[in-house]
Amino acid sequence: VAEIRPNGPDVKTIVLKSEDGAPLAPFRAGQYVSVTAHIGETVTTRAYSLSGSPAWAKRGEYNIAVRRDPNGFVSPWVQDTWQVGQKLTISGPQGQLYYERLRDAKKVVALAGGVGITPFMAMARALRDGLEDFDLTIIYGSRTEAGIVYKKELEEVAAACDKVHVVHVLSDEEKEGY
């Protein structure tokens, strides 16, 4: 664990880096890693979507976001006990929620809610970095403006890349612009 930073009221972004700075396994935007958790005498795994650009794996970095579920077993443990410098066991990238040129349309509409934005954040970053070539419109639901995960980053990527468009929808408050 290289860095932990807040990302909304109940979400933390966790920056994972290789111990020696070596590149990490490459991934496609939309994939996830499984993290092994040793909690007391229990060993379990949880899948977390990678939210960083696939280009970051070359510099030995993955990003995940973890939302605290007050009734959860792993997420409170992650948020309360993980510290910078902690070593983790994670799988290589997995999953098929990525853009496939031969399979998918050139214009993609993604629906996301809350921390479910993470795979689409990776896609937006990949588009910005020139690693993918499709048009992405994200319809992103949040309860409140304060609860929008990656709000600033989404705005920056959309401003920098004309292939990324974000439409925010709020369920628990009415605000101009949403």
Task: Give the location of each predicted region.
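FNR/FR-type flavoprotein reductase catalytic core
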Residues: 71-178
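Ferredoxin-reductase
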Residues: 1-87, 106, 142-144, 155-158, ...
